[in-house]
From Swiss-Prot:
SUPFAM superfamilies to which the protein is assigned, alphabetical: Ribosome inactivating proteins (RIP) (SSF56371)
Description of post-translational modifications: Bound to a branched hexasaccharide.
Name of the protein in its database record: Ribosome-inactivating protein beta-momorcharin
Alphabetized UniProt keyword annotations: Antiviral protein, Glycoprotein, Hydrolase, Plant defense, Protein synthesis inhibitor, Signal, Toxin
Active-site residues annotated for this sequence: Y93, Y132, E181, R184
Signal sequence, renumbered to the chain: 1-23
One GO process term, biological-process aspect: regulation of defense response to virus
EC number in record: 3.2.2.22
Organism: Momordica charantia
Pfam families documented for this protein: RIP
Catalytic activity field: Endohydrolysis of the N-glycosidic bond at one specific adenosine on the 28S rRNA
Sections of the chain in a coiled coil: none
PANTHER family in the record: PTHR33453, RIBOSOME-INACTIVATING PROTEIN
Role summary: Irreversibly relaxes supercoiled DNA and catalyzes double-stranded breakage. Also acts as a ribosome inactivating protein.
Length: 286
């Protein structure tokens, strides 16, 4: 009996703290409301494993085992077409999507994605990467000129379901902003949730937040050793087009708005940042 108890405690000890993706997240636009969209984004965030919280914001893992690296968003359009979108939990990037027996991968998708995701499908590599510059070039449009909103998301799902090569880049821009970016920023989530029946063009505040997530994440982390002050200010733009700087964690841009922090340990050249991460015990997960 004692041996069994000890074994049980050992198993529990091994698994406590090991990050896991909690499963797929579903969203059906045919019955969507502002409330169900908000719940979808909240559920999406909740599936993402994190190291610890920094100023009450989850800090994503920089490295995680292949088996836990991706989660799926199952999205259904107004016309009941469903695609499964694969998200990398280390950075909330869209890496691939599946429609029926075919799957499509961004050009820079990690090798693990090809090995793990959508087995049994015919895998196609898209002729562009998933970054905004590449997608806007492929779409022949900038984000400011592409509609967002739940109707736009439904149309994007339909485009991707049937894979219209000409329209796919724009559809992917809609998909990324209404899912991944909304998970990162409460401001974007709330903006999309207002547009259940109509669409909108993203304002400059949305675009600048999307562009500066990495910079904001890094400065929020570094602020722990600087009394909440940023080492370097982060430039953003207001909806009116006015430019301003975020200089500390007490800013409204940070508090209640940023919901996930990118862990830049793997890519930053700042040795102090890397050292601090190590001292805090953020470890590589195998």
């Amino acid at each position: 009996m004692v041996k069994c108890l000890l074994l049980s405690f050992l198993i529990i000890a091994i698994f406590i703290g090991v990050p896991t993706a909690k499963g797929d997240v579903n969203f059906d636009l045919s019955t969507a409301t502002a409330k169900t969209y908000t719940k979808f984004i909240e559920d999406f965030r909740a599936t993402l494993p994190f190291s610890h919280k920094v100023y009450d914001i989850p800090l994503l893992y920089s490295t995680i085992s292949d088996s836990r690296r991706f989660i799926l968003l199952n999205l259904t359009s107004y016309a009941y077409e469903t695609i499964s979108v694969a998200i990398d939990v280390t950075n909330v990037y869209v890496v691939a999507y599946r429609t029926r027996d075919v799957s499509y991968f961004f050009k820079e998708s990690p090798p693990e994605a090809y090995n793990i995701l959508f087995k049994g499908t015919r895998k196609i590599t898209l002729p562009y990467t998933g970054n905004y510059e590449n997608l806007q070039t492929a779409a022949h449009k900038i984000r400011e000129n592409i509609d967002l909103g739940l109707p736009a998301l439904s149309s994007a799902i339909t485009t991707l379901f049937y894979y219209n090569a000409q329209s796919a880049p724009s559809a992917l821009l809609v998909l990324i902003q209404t899912t991944a970016e909304a998970a990162r920023f409460k401001y974007i989530e709330r903006h999309v949730a207002k547009y259940v029946a109509t669409n909108f063009k993203p304002n400059l505040a949305i675009i600048s937040l999307e562009n500066q997530w990495s910079a904001l994440s890094k400065q929020i982390f570094l602020a722990q050793n600087q009394g909440g002050k940023f080492r370097n200010p982060v430039d953003l733009i207001k909806p009116t087009g006015e430019r301003f700087q975020v200089t500390n964690v007490d800013s409204d841009v940070v508090k209640g708005n940023i919901k996930l922090l990118l862990n830049s340990r793997a890519s930053t050249a700042d040795e102090n940042f890397i050292t601090t991460m190590t001292l805090l015990g953020e470890s590589v997960v195998n």
